[in-house]
Amino acid sequence: MTRPLIQLALDSLDAGQTLKLASQAAPFVDIFEIGTPCIKHNGISIVRDLKTRFPNKLLLVDLKTMDAGEYEATPFYAAGADICTVLGVSGSATIAGVVKAAQAHDAEVQVDLINVPDKLACAREAARLGAQIVGVHTGLDAQAAGQTPYADLQAVSRLGLPVRLSVAGGVNQSTVTQVKKAGADIIVVGAAIYGAPAPDVAAREIRELADGNHHQFIMSKLSGVLASTDRSHEARLTAMLEGSRRIFVTGAGRSGLIAKFFAMRLMHGGYDVYVVGEIVTPSIRQGDLFIVISGSGETETMLAFTKRAREMGARIVLISTKGSSTIGDLADLTLQVGTPEQYKKTVGMPMGTTFELSTLLMLEATVAHLIHAKKIPEEQMRTRHANLE
């Protein structure tokens, strides 16, 4: 099971207290929820304040929209909301309106199943309409009557819908593991944190209980990206390598480190390979292959290099998170690693690490493919490895 996200419900009417609590819990939570009472009392300004102070946190605005979905949600997405909620009981037209508003701002929608009689049917409809999150929610009044969300969570989880499941309703330290096992992708915590004597300590405890094994989480995320990557990439890239006179590789930042790793492995395989930017790298010519690693496909320095390589007649391969981009328009072949949705900040691995690590694994698989195809003995590869270290 992947690492669930922790969502903190900020329900205070006092904006100052809301910001203070957010600061205390920030190191341990992934999503700040501006609760319905808070957003009604403070208005859209609280969205802007939280987004300014915590730009790297996801921001959910619990609008509980009941009508006029697109019209109501649009200004909140424009102000910085990453997710807005719409009530499942509102009906398909209203949900579709919020989905439309979210799509216009590259954001997400959560459909709240609170008070929905047929939760399974509503969850299916939410997924069909394009919502990314379904919220299994037992409200405060229902909690007071002894109700919990756990049975409903398990039932919705068994549907296997292409959505993330959020659970809210009395979650605390004693129930975090239970809701995680029941299938929650997002665990919403309110009073267990904001009602604790030390909110930061409570948030850390819940974070630790939810996390489990970090190694398992990272492996699960990378496996998911590679599973959604076209398996023909290795063979297609190998064909490009085999048809080239020389190979030039490049990338910015961490992508550059991956490019250097790939260059070393190609050298082991007997290829004439160079890293762009090194003082000994020669000029690129027709018949050469230029491989650029850029997650966005828009990196300015990489774009300039790509244009020059195109002018000189080199063939170009882009490795990216996107199937279409400015650099991709210049490339002979674009190898998309995973899907764009897997690189949103909801994935739980910060600062873009998922792309770099996944690309590293894909390129290592390419090396394994070409070594097998060319029947290169490992002993021969070892003779090419650096011996001045």
Residue ranges of model-derived segments:
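Glycine-rich phosphate-binding active-site loops on the catalytic face of alpha/beta enzymes
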Residues: A81-A93, V134-A144, A182-I206
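Conserved N-terminal beta1-alpha1 strand-loop-helix module at the mouth
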Residues: M1-E70, E125-A126, D200-V201
